[in-house]
């Protein structure tokens, strides 16, 4: 079997950033998949499931209620390796196009202090696995270390 595209990225060189992972044609439409890499693969600890689960709930809620992106949001969810998230948007985008949206979204997560949306037994299959404090911290870290001063080296996969 051939490697899938995401396994051909050099994860030794990969740093936290906002990357286009792939673009898929569905009929006449394009769906862009973004790699929102929050930690350095194989260099630092991965995120725990509780904070990732909290970020997933907050980000999905934010995106699906966003005035410009609600109807374009296909999916937001965690990477199996726990170093980041995937965001799928309807449309043909480049990484730099969504940096303002990512800043807005991660500021929302950083500043969120209320009850996590969907964090109940009725709404979620694993509602007890949440950690809002760590989600706030990781969002702040991603903003401060990556998003607020992002450049081309964090927008295009390394060669």
Describe every region a protein language model picked out.
Residues 31-65, 75:
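Active/ligand-binding-proximal structured segments within catalytic/core domains
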Residues 1-42, 156-159:
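Non-catalytic terminal extensions that flank enzyme cores
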Residues 88-91, 95-159:
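Acidic/histidine-enriched segments that form metal/cofactor-coordinating
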Residues 58, 62-67, 104, 108, ...:
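Generic non-transmembrane alpha-helical segments
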Residues 34-36, 85-90:
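Short, well-ordered beta-strand elements
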Residues 79-84:
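Short, conserved phosphate-binding/catalytic loop or strand-edge motifs used
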Residues 70-76:
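Catalytic micro-motifs at enzyme active sites that drive phosphoryl/nucleotidyl and oxygen chemistry
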Residues 13-18, 61-70:
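Conserved alpha/beta core surface patches that mediate binding of polyanionic ligands
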């Amino acid at each position: 079997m051939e490697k899938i595209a995401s396994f051909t990225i050099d994860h030794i060189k990969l740093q936290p950033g906002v990357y286009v992972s792939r673009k898929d044609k569905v009929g006449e439409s394009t769906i862009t998949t973004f790699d929102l890499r929050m930690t350095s693969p194989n260099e630092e600890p991965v995120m725990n499931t509780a904070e990732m689960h909290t970020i997933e709930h907050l980000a999905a809620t934010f995106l699906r209620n966003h005035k410009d992106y609600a109807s374009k949001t296909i999916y937001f969810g965690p990477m199996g390796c726990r170093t980041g998230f995937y965001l799928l948007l309807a449309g043909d985008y480049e990484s730099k196009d969504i940096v303002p949206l990512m800043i807005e979204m991660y500021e929302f997560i950083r500043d969120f202090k209320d009850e996590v949306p969907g964090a109940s037994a009725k709404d979620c299959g694993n509602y007890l696995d949440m950690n809002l404090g760590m989600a706030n911290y990781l969002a702040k870290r991603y903003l401060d270390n990556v998003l607020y001063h992002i450049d081309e080296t964090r927008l295009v996969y390394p060669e």
